[in-house]
């Protein structure tokens, strides 16, 4: 007889699936940088739709960005969603999915020794490099007064980097056509060329930026050149990577922004605030002895001297412990007759 089915009803939580996350759990489960991009895209769409802020202030224009010091346009123009529902949902999903996988995998904690807030510094540096490269190329092509939305270029850039890690992973293109991950950026470029001719150049700039980062990160001419020149190494242009590392000045700046530089100071302050009776200290707890008396046993001196003993002293074995065990005497006293016998 078949077992009971998991019947879900509209009322109560008797058939609730514990694996389904609520909105709060879903939001908290997103990596921090991706969460910021995801939230910013949604907030910009809402405030723009409600006319609380003119969407013009989100668009990238070189003259306004740098001459008028409206630096936020560098970021807002990369996550500005389409005014149409379906393209906007696809763009939002692409930002969430590609960015979260890069932050967890390609630039994640498993591939570096960073911990805490600093675990995301490499991904932050990657995004800053790509955004600056995309905006620079766009300014060269379109000029300093041309307004442009860079969302398609930003998505193409992170999609290309994502495709390197998922080259042999089969995915469903728009949920219909199975394709390999390594061909996904090229298919996106083709779709942009056929249906969105206005975004094709921006998408191509993003694709080129992602490829440029790969070349710098591997010190090669990239996987496309490896395929054209028929390199014997199939990983040419892909690995080993990590050669375009985050510079020290960016790491220091990021630590100040995120507050990571205060972690050591906070630990020291917390230790200083602990009462002296609760601190774990290392003090001598053995018996004292006068100069010239027999040394204490090993168990009495191990609290201090063993911590400072060198490796050669520890390896010398018990020979160092077989010392004089007779009666002690003060310095300057003569030996008693019983001792001389």
UniProtKB/Swiss-Prot annotation:
It comes from the Eukaryota. Keywords: Endoplasmic reticulum, Membrane, Stress response, Transmembrane, Transmembrane helix. GO terms for biological process: endoplasmic reticulum unfolded protein response; ERAD pathway; regulation of retrograde protein transport, ER to cytosol. It is found in: Endoplasmic reticulum membrane. Residues 1-41, 144-170, 214-341 are cytoplasmic. Its main location: endoplasmic reticulum. SUPFAM superfamilies: Rhomboid-like. It is a multi-pass membrane protein. One of its GO terms (molecular function) is signal recognition particle binding. The chain crosses the membrane at residues 42-62, 123-143, 171-191, 193-213. Residues 276-341 are annotated as: Disordered. Induction: By endoplasmic reticulum stress. Residues 276-286, 296-341 have a biased composition (Polar residues). One of its GO terms (cellular component) is endoplasmic reticulum membrane. Residues 63-122, 192 are lumenal. PANTHER family: DER1-LIKE PROTEIN, DERLIN (PTHR11009). May be involved in the degradation process of some misfolded endoplasmic reticulum (ER) luminal proteins. Its precise role is however unclear and its inability to complement der1 mutations, suggests either that it is not involved in degradation process of misfolded proteins, or that it participates in the destruction of specific misfolded ER luminal proteins. Belongs to the derlin family. This is DER1-like family member protein 1. It comes from Saccharomyces cerevisiae (strain ATCC 204508 / S288c) (Baker's yeast).
